[in-house]
Amino acid sequence: MLQYQIDRIDHQIADDRSQTGTFLIGPLERGQATTLGNSLRRVLMGGLEGSAVTAVRIAGINHEYATIPGVREDVLDILLNCKQLSINSSSPDLEIGRLVASGPMDVKANDIQFSSQVEIVDGEKPIATIQEGHNLELEIHVERGVGYRPVDRKSEETTAIDLLQIDAVFMPVKRVNFTIDETAVAEGGTGRERLKMEVVTDGSTSPDDAIAEAANQLIELFQPLATVTMVEEIPEEPEPSPEAQIPLEELNLSVRAYNCLKRAQVNSVSDLMGFSYEDLLEIKNFGSKSADEVIDALERIGISIPQSRTSV
């Protein structure tokens, strides 16, 4: 078996504290770079545990379409700012942060008081702007989870009239790209490859730790295959994933792509999962740019579709 190594050749931290790491993995046998890159990318984008704001309580407010006296931002803006917080919670339980502020004040993430188990990655993230003579009181709920969790309108928690639920994005990795480079030809004429991988995180974890965690998950996934035991099982009907239930509107597609998909009777991610890349291109007025836009939007929530139709 060919021995390879992984080297981090670049590491950058942006103003918003997001981190970008570039790694070079090799030498690999021909075809192994694609296998490794696709496997790592899928786990990195949708399989890692992260922290997210799941609900916000604002004093005197009982629905998200309200405005707050003396606060420049409306409730929807404040909820969006809270949703975009990069947070790292080491607690397996619900953590609650609190803010009591008086104007004039530009409220930032660092002004929210959490326990020592919660770290706010980008403390300069704006939350709200309070005018003189006015107050703002917030209660922010933070949980750990995996992937994307939409609000369950039927749950008991959502029945609290003043607790505003948020669709939670627990994914600490924002983007993964990889390329494959040909290296020297080995003895016997076999080509070698190197995998170059770029990993961008929200700052709640480092690219190094993200790759290590993804690799450990893949090891746990494949380890049972080393000792295969044949067991007859009764097949179960798979339950639809939360991601499949996301409506088309929440993918934030361009107007052109959105309208074309709507005309093709595509209303949710579940509908898109029945398409291949080739199928998308056959939609009327749907070009490669729109198809690439859909692919990128699906990959942000950990879903990929095949390049071509499955041959019979």
UniProtKB/Swiss-Prot annotation:
The keyword Cell membrane belongs to this UniProt entry's keyword annotation: no
Molecular function GO terms recorded: DNA binding; DNA-directed RNA polymerase activity; protein dimerization activity
Region (Alpha C-terminal domain (alpha-CTD)): 241-312
A GO-annotated cellular component: cytoplasm
Biological-process GO terms, alphabetical: DNA-templated transcription
EC number: 2.7.7.6
Record's catalysed reaction(s): RNA(n) + a ribonucleoside 5'-triphosphate = RNA(n+1) + diphosphate
InterPro entries attached to this UniProt entry: DNA-dir_RNA_pol_insert, DNA-dir_RNA_pol_RpoA/D/Rpb3, DNA-dir_RpoA, RBP11-like, RNAP_asu_C, RNApol_insert_sf
Keywords, comma-separated and alphabetical: DNA-directed RNA polymerase, Nucleotidyltransferase, Transcription, Transferase
Region (Alpha N-terminal domain (alpha-NTD)): 1-229
Keyword Transport in record: no
Family, per entry: Belongs to the RNA polymerase alpha chain family.
UniProt xrefs under NCBIfam families: PRK05182.2-2, PRK05182.2-5, rpoA
Task of the protein: DNA-dependent RNA polymerase catalyzes the transcription of DNA into RNA using the four ribonucleoside triphosphates as substrates.
Domain notes: The N-terminal domain is essential for RNAP assembly and basal transcription, whereas the C-terminal domain is involved in interaction with transcriptional regulators and with upstream promoter elements.
Subunit structure: In cyanobacteria the RNAP catalytic core is composed of 2 alpha, 1 beta, 1 beta', 1 gamma and 1 omega subunit. When a sigma factor is associated with the core the holoenzyme is formed, which can initiate transcription.
Protein name: DNA-directed RNA polymerase subunit alpha
